[in-house]
Curated annotation (Swiss-Prot):
A Pfam family assignment: Glycos_transf_2
Membrane topology qualifier: Multi-pass membrane protein
Keywords: Carbohydrate metabolism, Glycerol metabolism, Glycosyltransferase, Lipid biosynthesis, Lipid metabolism, Magnesium, Membrane, Transferase, Transmembrane, Transmembrane helix
Superkingdom: Bacteria
Recorded family membership: Belongs to the glycosyltransferase 2 family.
One GO cellular component term: plasma membrane
Annotated InterPro entries: Glyco_trans_2-like (IPR001173), Glycosyltr_2/OpgH_subfam (IPR050321), Nucleotide-diphossugar_trans (IPR029044)
GO terms under biological process: glycerol metabolic process; membrane lipid biosynthetic process
Native source organism of the sequence: Nostoc sp. (strain PCC 7120 / SAG 25.82 / UTEX 2576)
Stated name of the protein: Beta-monoglucosyldiacylglycerol synthase
Compartments in which it is found: Membrane
Biological function: Glucosyltransferase involved in the biosynthesis of the non-bilayer-forming membrane lipid beta-monoglucosyldiacylglycerol which contributes to regulate the properties and stability of the membrane. Catalyzes the transfer of a glucosyl residue from UDP-Glc to diacylglycerol (DAG) acceptor to form the corresponding beta-glucosyl-DAG (1,2-diacyl-3-O-(beta-D-glucopyranosyl)-sn-glycerol). It can only use UDP-Glc as sugar donor. Two types of DAG (dipalmitoyl-DAG (DPDAG) and 1-oleoyl-2-palmitoyl-DAG (OPDAG)) can be used as sugar acceptors, but OPDAG is preferred.
EC number(s) given by UniProt: 2.4.1.336
Gene Ontology molecular function: hexosyltransferase activity; magnesium ion binding
C-alpha cells in the first residue's frame, strides 16, 4: 500500500482512505528488529526524534515552572481545566443502546490469531462455534501463525467437527505478527462485521446478540466489549488487573457519552468492514494494532462504542515481570500513536470534542508521569513541595472515583452478586495501589523511546487455560 500522508484539505468528503498511512513493510512477531527510519513510510519515520523533542519540552517546561514566579498559578489553572473536564466525565450519562435488530442480522466473521496456544485453543474454538447466532450468519477463522506445538493438529481435528470453523496456517516466512495475520485472512472473510478475539478469550454465548445492534447507528465503526480477568482471584496482580479493567471500561463509556473517544482493546473488538477497509486494515508498523486502529478510525470520522455487558474474559498475567513486559508494550504503543498522528490531531480531524478529550487523556496518562521526574528532582533540590501536586492529586482522585464506579456498575449488571460498598471500597483501594505501577511504566517508556532505536518487539503472553 502507498505510504502517502493525509491531504491538506480538511473536508471530510475529500479525505483519502486511511490505508494511505500504512505500508507493506512489516516485522516478525517474536524477533527484535532495530528499525531504521529510512525503512519506514514517512508518517512513521523519526519516532525517536519526536519522542526526544517531547521529552525535552516536558522536562525543560517543568523545570521552568519551578523557576518562574507564576509557576504555581499556571499549575492551579491547569488543574482547574482538567477538573472541569473530569467533572464532565463523571456526570456524563452513558448512552442507552438499542438491543434489537431492525431487519435481518448481518454476517459476522470472527478472527483469532494464534501461535503455540495448545492449552487454550480447543476451548475457544468450541466456544466460538456454539454462539447464539443464526447458523449461516457467522464464521470463525483461526489463523495459525506457524505454531510449533500441537495447535495445528488440534485445529485440524476441530475443523472436521465444525463446518463454520476455518483455519489458515501461515508460513515461517510470514511477517507482520498479529496485524499481518489478521490482514492476511481478511480478504477471505465474508462478514460485514469483523470480530477479533485473543486465543485465551472466554466469550459469552449471547455476545453477538448484544454487540451487533450497536452497529445500526451508521457512524459506529467499531465496538469494544469490557475485558474481564478470568483468574482474578489468583493473586495481588490479577486482582489489580480486575479493578483496572473496571476503571478502563467506566472511563471509556463516560468519555464516549461526553462526545470523547472510545478505544479498542484488542480482545473483544468488533469492527465494521467498511470502516476497516477505509483505514487500510491493521497497521503492521506498530506493536499495539488495536490502539493504532483506534486513532485511525476516529481520524476517519467513525465512532467507537464501549459495552459493559457482556464481557470477554481473558487470563491476567500473574507475575510482576510479565506485567512489566505487557504494560511497557501497551505504554509504548499508546504513546507512539501520538507521535505518528500528531499533525492530524492538531488539525482537529476528529472534531473538537474528540480532540479535546484525547489531549486531556494524553496530558494525564503520558505527559504528567513524564513530568513527575524533573518535578521531583527540582522539589528535592529547592526543598519545596512538588509543583505538580494538585494535578497529581486530581488524577489519583479520578482513578479512585472511576474504579469504584466501574466496580459498582459491574456488580449492578451481575445481579446475582451482591457486594457491599465496603467490599467495593477495599477493592478500589487495592486497585489504586496496584495502579501506581503505571507511573513507573509511563515515565520510563517515554524516556526510553527518546534514546533507544525503535524496537518492534512482542513478548508472548503464556496462556495456561486455568482461568475460570
Amino acid at each position: 500500500m502507498p505510504a502517502n500522508s493525509w491531504p491538506d484539505n480538511d473536508s471530510y468528503k475529500e479525505l483519502d482512505p486511511l490505508n494511505s498511512l500504512l505500508s507493506d513493510v512489516s516485522t516478525t512477531e517474536e524477533s527484535v528488529v532495530e528499525t531504521r527510519d529510512l525503512s519506514l513510510p514517512s508518517r512513521f519515520q523519526g519516532r525517536r526524534g519526536k519522542a526526544a523533542l517531547v521529552l525535552t519540552i516536558v522536562w525543560s517546561g517543568t523545570i521552568a515552572l519551578h523557576l518562574v514566579s507564576w509557576g504555581s498559578i499556571f499549575i492551579l489553572g491547569l488543574t482547574t481545566v482538567l477538573g472541569i473536564h473530569a467533572l464532565g466525565v463523571v456526570f456524563a450519562r452513558p448512552r442507552h443502546y438499542q438491543k434489537e435488530i431492525q431487519g435481518s442480522l448481518p454476517f459476522v466473521s470472527i478472527l483469532v490469531a494464534a501461535k503455540n496456544e495448545e492449552a487454550v485453543i480447543a476451548k475457544l474454538a468450541k466456544n466460538l462455534c456454539n454462539l447464539e447466532y443464526p447458523n449461516g450468519q457467522y464464521e470463525v477463522w483461526i489463523i495459525d501463525d506457524n505454531s510449533t506445538d500441537k495447535t495445528p493438529h488440534i485445529l485440524a481435528e476441530l475443523a472436521k467437527e465444525y463446518d463454520k470453523l476455518k483455519v489458515l496456517r501461515r508460513s515461517a516466512q510470514a511477517t507482520g505478527g498479529k496485524s499481518g495475520a489478521l490482514n492476511q485472512v481478511l480478504p477471505l472473510t465474508q462478514g460485514e462485521i469483523i470480530a477479533v478475539f485473543d486465543a485465551d478469550a472466554q466469550v459469552a454465548s449471547d455476545m453477538l446478540l448484544h454487540v451487533v445492534p450497536l452497529f445500526q447507528r451508521e457512524k459506529v465503526g467499531a465496538v469494544q466489549v469490557r475485558k474481564a480477568i478470568a483468574n482474578a482471584k489468583e493473586n495481588f496482580w490479577t486482582k489489580g488487573q480486575m479493578a483496572e479493567m473496571s476503571l478502563d471500561i467506566w472511563f471509556q463509556q463516560q468519555r464516549t457519552a461526553l462526545g470523547g473517544i472510545g478505544e479498542l482493546r484488542g480482545n473483544g473488538q468488533f469492527v465494521r468492514r467498511q470502516a476497516l477497509d477505509s483505514c487500510g486494515g491493521w497497521n503492521e508498523e506498530t506493536i499495539t494494532d488495536d490502539l493504532d486502529l483506534t486513532f485511525r478510525l476516529h481520524l476517519d470520522k467513525w465512532d467507537i462504542e464501549c459495552l459493559f455487558y457482556p464481557a470477554v474474559q481473558e487470563e491476567g498475567v500473574t507475575t510482576a515481570i510479565a506485567l512489566w513486559h505487557q504494560r511497557n508494550r501497551w505504554a509504548e504503543g499508546g504513546y507512539q500513536r501520538y507521535l505518528d498522528y500528531w499533525d492530524l490531531i492538531l488539525k482537529n480531524r476528529m472534531g473538537t470534542r474528540k480532540t479535546w478529550d484525547m489531549l486531556m487523556f494524553m496530558l494525564t496518562m503520558y505527559i504528567l508521569p513524564t513530568a513527575a521526574i524533573p518535578d521531583l528532582l527540582m522539589a528535592l533540590t529547592r526543598h519545596r513541595p512538588p509543583m505538580l501536586g494538585p494535578v497529581t492529586g486530581l488524577s489519583v482522585t479520578m482513578s479512585v472515583v472511576g474504579m469504584f464506579a466501574g466496580l459498582r456498575r459491574i456488580r449492578q449488571e451481575q445481579k446475582f452478586q451482591v457486594h457491599t460498598p465496603f467490599v467495593l471500597l477495599l477493592q478500589t483501594m487495592r486497585g489504586t495501589l496496584y495502579m501506581l505501577h503505571w507511573l513507573v511504566v509511563m515515565s520510563s517508556t517515554t524516556a526510553r523511546m527518546s534514546f533507544r532505536p525503535k524496537r518492534l518487539k512482542w513478548v508472548k503472553t503464556v496462556h495456561t487455560g486455568t482461568g475460570e
